[in-house]
């Protein structure tokens, strides 16, 4: 029985909807899929699909020639003196050098960022300047939360398919070490009024309106504007509503660290990384992600306290992705142009889909709707996919979407299908680690996921891959890529 509230006790979050279970991650997905939450309305969220058949234009498919990224570094550490332009430019410069592309051939620069630099908000254009590309290359910036760089890739693909461009530099970056800190609205309005004051008495009179409390900085909140809930609170809600155990979440986190550690040790991940030389010294290279823990264990993860719901919660710092700084980039071309220039691309975009749902329902469940749409557009099934790369914002979000994939109830009530999308095979899932271990710079993660998937498909000699990304605002993204 719940303890009675006293005057010294704050109101507590609601208790879990069901008694807590201790299912493993495999059991959650393979045996308990139908405990996933559905709205019961029978009406699916709106989904936008790239094409109803294989994505191809007059000059062939859209080729992803290569991709790379900076190390992904926990905010406030090695990259604290690098802004978002620095990070995007490190990845872009390295990519241009690796591919030996003639900069004069690049038609467009498209980059995603969630928290842009206030002094230079058009990141796509600033990358052109910072990487010494020709000044006549247009630069565009997009913000689709955690799906920003996948949206940048999609915009680049669309530019190629419509003939606007032949070659596009796309990617994203985030510097959460350098998030702009705001003043209160009253302070901001007073400063604006002060800038218009012409005499000393006018300035003094304006300043006299301020009180010390007005000058307190306002820290940015990683929360939904429409619901007021933070990402973590939303993911905690998903864990409860989808009846996901703490054990299963910790198992996903452990898998992420173990696989990322192995892929770092054998060079699979470091091959994709551009070394960075952060200021002020510019003399100490940063060459690897600093969030990967090779010594992680279920026992250590189980000792961590809940982070968002202190009383009933199952989300911890260990099974959630950390705030991270980093940049990423990919080089896109029409298939025809890639062949003419002698490139062997990493792969090709076969289809993609975006979806949007009510953020007050299950904020990060978008991939459960976007993935089946992308698979249908590509003309394939989940069982045809060789590797699955899912962005790990939180382990609860991963398991929620996996359960939706496998659930007959979800398929019928949410997707209008007679059969579920399918059970994700853990042996084909995030095989070189994911965002929980590697890190999650919001604007850079999408391009990292796409590149990481294609590198591993190439190494294994496999063909088809599926990318999924959840994002703030109830957005979901999915892409099918192919190597042949």
Q: Across the structure, where does each feature detected by a protein language model lie?
A:
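Conserved catalytic cysteine-centered active-site region
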Residues: 20-22, 33, 82, 113-168, ...
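Flexible glycine-/small-residue-enriched beta->alpha junction loops
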Residues: 167-237
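Conserved active-site "lid/cap" helical segment
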Residues: 40, 44-114, 118-119, 123-131, ...
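Glycine- and Gly-Pro-enriched alpha-helical subdomains that act as flexible
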Residues: 335-384, 402
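N-terminal extracellular/periplasmic Venus flytrap/periplasmic-binding protein-like
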Residues: 19-54, 60, 68-70, 80-90, ...
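Short glycine/threonine-rich loop-to-helix capping motif typified by GTGT followed
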Residues: 117-123, 284-288, 358-367, 392-412, ...
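Active-site-proximal alpha-helical scaffold in enzymes
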Residues: 142-174, 182, 239-268, 329-336, ...
